[in-house]
């Protein structure tokens, strides 16, 4: 019998499957925070719900023995939210008890409950948006879109991928093999989908929902219980998520400990390593540093580990029709959320002899100046700039800006800005530094996370593309952007992207930016270079989260 929540959301699931097959634009979750869509009071209600959580204890009825929480808004104030402190052993014991009936419920229940959680999360998009804004430093519009509907899109994508794999496995089958003149051999076979076990989702501090939802919902949709361990600097968005998930599970008749929160104070690295190597943790989804991701891949051998780590995203400029349009697009990508996106560009390669344009040749210096001026134009008005660049998530990024200044000649210096609504906000404009491929490779072959970019002189476009491909392959990258009107150069760019295992964008000058990745159409990460060992979202991301156990017995032939 079909689970009622599966039946309730089946049409959405069907549309999601169709969207994945065609790879066109589709989303059931409106990305604009419009009162016509979400309700006239939705924004105010969401903000009030967020404010009501501040300086309070976040109540979750799960095993706990104390309180933790030291989040501080990048916009300049302490959140003061305290969360249940949970010891791993009693928590995992409770999760194991909850896992058993959840596993027996079957795929219709797993999918239906997951989709209901997602619908409830969409209703809470404004509350989540304010929590994302004040833990990550994203400006409100990005916090709403990336933290809400876009994250929900990625969650739905994972659920649809999971269902696509689960539905291929029949519950039972009749098998009959002819035996010539003798009666046929006949068997009845039963196939049971067996989830891997307990999943551990390790969140990051810049995109706590967008990067965590795919793993969380891939686990749930394949029948696994999930322990959500947020980054200590961005607990609240995932705490709200867990609260909603537990409410839905309880209403659906399941133990809410199928989804639990494990909140921590800062400097929790030792605890994370202990959690990740527990024998009962069978799945791990991680977003964060290369160092920590590599440690998990090497040491959490009892689990299947999905990682997204650091990378060096790159732009190659060979030729452009309109340098102003190209520079505007690049500048927006550099400024958006102060470069604190895993897809944000860092290295911009320009031939030292200049580039071709519709108006003639532009020198290397003129190209660098065009980009610098475009960034400056976007950030010159503080009131407008802060709605684009947001705030810096933590002091380590500010310190990194200071170190990057000394790497080369500064084309555009980073400046602190005063936020008109939050006077203590940590706001800094992008830094552009000139480097040279001949002498500075040790400086630009690592990620400089934050509002930091390098305009790098190369001997030729051929060298630029060779660098882009080799750096992606060796050091990791999620995005590569190339500007060229030459079809031969574009073909070499495709080959460099394939060599580097990195997504390629060509000649972006309009309203699409290299940072952006659209669910149901764009694959985020390839798993083909060190930046990530998995893709959001393909069959490989979900299929290994369960196994199939069969039983068979002789029966009388039907014929």
What are these regions (language model features)?
Residues 116-124, 244-252, 370, 374, ...:
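Generic non-transmembrane alpha-helical segments
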Residues 199, 259-265, 347-349, 451, ...:
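Extended hydrophobic secondary-structure segments that form protein cores and membrane-embedded regions
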Residues 71-72, 307-309, 340-343, 443-449, ...:
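Short, flexible turn/loop "capping" segments at secondary-structure junctions
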């Amino acid at each position: 019998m079909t689970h009622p929540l599966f039946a309730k959301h089946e049409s959405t699931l069907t549309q999601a499957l169709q969207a994945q097959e065609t790879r066109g634009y589709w989303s059931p979750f409106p990305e604009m925070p419009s009162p016509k869509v979400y309700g006239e009071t939705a924004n105010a209600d969401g903000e009030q719900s967020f404010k009501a959580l501040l300086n309070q204890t976040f109540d979750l009825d799960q095993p706990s023995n104390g309180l933790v929480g030291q989040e501080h808004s990048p916009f300049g104030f302490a959140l003061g939210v305290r969360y249940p402190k949970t010891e791993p052993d009693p928590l995992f014991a409770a999760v194991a008890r909850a896992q058993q009936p959840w596993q027996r419920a079957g795929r219709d229940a797993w999918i239906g409950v997951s989709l209901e959680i997602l619908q409830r999360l969409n209703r809470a998009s404004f509350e989540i948006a304010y929590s994302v804004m004040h833990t990550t430093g994203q400006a409100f519009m990005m916090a709403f879109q990336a933290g809400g509907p876009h994250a929900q899109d990625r969650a739905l994508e994972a659920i649809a991928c999971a269902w696509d794999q689960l539905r291929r496995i029949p519950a039972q089958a009749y098998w009959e093999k002819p035996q010539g003149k003798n009666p046929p051999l006949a068997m009845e076979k039963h196939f049971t989908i067996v989830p891997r076990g307990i999943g551990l989702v390790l969140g990051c501090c810049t995109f706590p929902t967008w990067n965590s939802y795919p793993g969380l919902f891939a686990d749930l949709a394949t029948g696994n219980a999930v322990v959500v361990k947020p980054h200590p600097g961005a607990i609240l968005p995932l705490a709200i998520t867990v609260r909603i998930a537990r409410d839905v599970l309880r209403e659906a008749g399941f133990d809410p400990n199928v989804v639990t929160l494990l909140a921590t104070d800062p400097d929790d690295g030792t605890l994370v390593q202990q959690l990740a190597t527990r024998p009962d943790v069978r799945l791990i989804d991680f977003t964060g540093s290369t160092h920590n991701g590599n440690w998990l891949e090497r040491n959490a051998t009892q689990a299947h580990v999905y990682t997204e780590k650091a990378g060096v995203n790159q732009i190659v400029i060979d030729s452009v029709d309109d340098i102003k349009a190209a520079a505007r697009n690049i500048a927006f990508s550099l400024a958006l959320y102060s470069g604190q996106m895993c897809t944000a560009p860092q290295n911009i390669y320009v031939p030292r002899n200049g580039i071709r344009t519709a108006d003639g040749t532009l020198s290397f210096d003129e190209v660098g100046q065009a980009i610098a001026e475009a960034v400056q134009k976007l950030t010159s008005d503080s009131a407008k700039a802060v709605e684009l660049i947001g705030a810096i998530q933590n002091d380590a990024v500010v310190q990194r800006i200071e170190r990057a200044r000394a790497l080369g000649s500064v084309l555009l210096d980073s400046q602190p800005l005063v936020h008109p609504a939050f006077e203590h906000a940590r706001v800094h404009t992008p830094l552009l530094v000139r480097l040279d491929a001949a002498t500075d490779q040790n400086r630009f072959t690592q990620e400089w996370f934050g509002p930091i970019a390098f305009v790098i002189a190369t001997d030729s476009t051929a060298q630029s593309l060779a660098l882009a491909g080799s750096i992606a392959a060796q050091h990791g990258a999620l995005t590569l952007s190339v500007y060229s009107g030459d079809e031969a150069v574009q073909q070499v760019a495709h080959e460099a992207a394939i060599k580097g295992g990195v997504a390629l964008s060509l000649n972006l000058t309009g309203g699409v930016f290299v940072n952006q990745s659209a669910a149901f159409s764009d694959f985020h990460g390839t798993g083909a270079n060190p930046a990530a060992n998995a893709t959001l979202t393909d069959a490989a991301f979900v299929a290994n989260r369960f196994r199939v156990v069969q039983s068979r017995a002789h029966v009388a032939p039907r014929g």
